[in-house]
Curated annotation (Swiss-Prot):
Family according to the record: Belongs to the NadC/ModD family.
Catalytic activity: nicotinate beta-D-ribonucleotide + CO2 + diphosphate = quinolinate + 5-phospho-alpha-D-ribose 1-diphosphate + 2 H(+)
Gene that produces this protein: nadC
Function: Involved in the catabolism of quinolinic acid (QA).
Species: Mycobacterium tuberculosis (strain ATCC 25618 / H37Rv)
Subunit-level organization: Homodimer. Hexamer formed by 3 homodimers.
UniProt binding sites for substrate: R105, T138, R139, K140, R162, K172, E201, D222, S248, G249, G250, V269, G270, A271
Protein's UniProt keywords contain Glycosyltransferase: yes
Any one GO BP annotation for this protein: quinolinate catabolic process
Entry-linked InterPro entries: Aldolase_TIM, NadC, NadC/ModD, Nicotinate_pribotase-like_C, Quinolinate_PRibosylTase_N_sf, Quinolinate_PRibosylTrfase_C, Quinolinate_PRibosylTrfase_N
Pfam family, one: QRPTase_N
Name of the protein in question: Nicotinate-nucleotide pyrophosphorylase [carboxylating]
């Protein structure tokens, strides 16, 4: 898929932090003691479980940082987005052994985390297949890793929500409390940022009824039951069909299809980035 400039910068920063954590107290003493300086090896990144791969370019950037571009050679690799079975070699390379072992943990931490996100996203995408609903991430990301986490969501077949606070407006309950009402908040945002897409969170059908005539780009249905979501879709379709609807809160893989079948446009899944399990990947020499 390839990393954007923003994602490349985020990857380099994450790699620098990871290597600093490993090396700030001194060099890799175990490797220096056990591996001759001239040693080279052939090694593979191997997944211990089925999943969707993401972050192999980040692995290469890690090797670049430790070994330089001439310190290793890639013999074979799969592409990000590939669905792989347990035991699959994701990438095989020849490398200077000391540098490879020094880079190993930073490389595996990032690839395992990003592949875990891609794998989880793909499971959600599979759960809603056959409906029009798309799986979308949130800003519930780990500090410093948002760009890479959102890349991994796309790699798994999901779509990205806003990247920050300035590329779209999202009116939530605290904004409503400050403005006085949900409609007042929406009008204030449109007056302040008329060129930005505006989304509004509602927590009741009454709030939905108040917002629909204003026709924001999207209405987020916060913790709606399935029957409420069905009603919201019916009202949207009859009153403001251009407005998109997103279900958020209380969703699970088990209920994803039920919500998607109501006709909403998106399911917002914060767990894709804030609490995902890593994909178990190891380095085999």
């Amino acid at each position: 898929m390839g990393l954007s400039d923003w994602e490349l910068a985020a990857a380099r920063a994450a790699i620098a932090r990871g290597l600093d954590e490993d090396l700030r107290y001194g060099p890799d003493v175990t490797t220096l003691a056990t591996v001759p300086a001239s040693a080279t090896t052939t090694a593979s990144l191997v997944t211990r479980e089925a999943g969707v791969v993401a972050g192999l370019d980040v692995a290469l950037l890690t090797l670049n940082e430790v070994l330089g571009t001439n310190g290793y050679r890639v013999l074979d690799r799969v592409e990000d987005g590939a669905r792989v079975p347990p035991g699959e070699a994701l990438m095989t390379l020849e490398a200077q052994t000391r540098g490879l072992l020094t880079a190993e943990r930073t490389m595996l931490n990032l690839v395992g985390h990003l592949s875990g996100i891609a794998t989880a996203t793909a499971a959600w995408v599979d759960a809603v297949r056959g409906t029009k609903a798309k799986i979308r991430d949130t800003r519930k990301t780990l500090p410093g890793l948002r760009a890479l986490q959102k890349y991994a969501v796309r790699t798994g077949g999901g779509v990205n929500h806003r990247l920050g606070l300035g590329d779209a407006a999202l009116i939530k309950d605290n904004h409503v409390a400050a403005a006085g009402s949900v409609v007042d908040a929406l009008r204030a945002v449109r007056n302040a940022a008329p060129d930005l897409p505006c989304e509004v969170e509602v927590d009741s059908l009454e709030q939905l009824d108040a917002v629909l005539p204003e026709k924001p780009e999207l209405i987020l249905l916060d913790n709606f039951a399935v029957w409420q979501t069905q009603t919201a879709v019916q009202r949207r379709d009859s009153r403001a069909p251009t407005v998109m609807l997103e279900s958020s809160g209380g969703l699970s893989l088990q209920t994803a299809a039920t919500y998607a079948e109501t006709g909403v446009d998106y399911l917002a899944v914060g767990a894709l980035t804030h609490s995902v399990r890593v994909l178990d990947i190891g380095l085999d020499m």
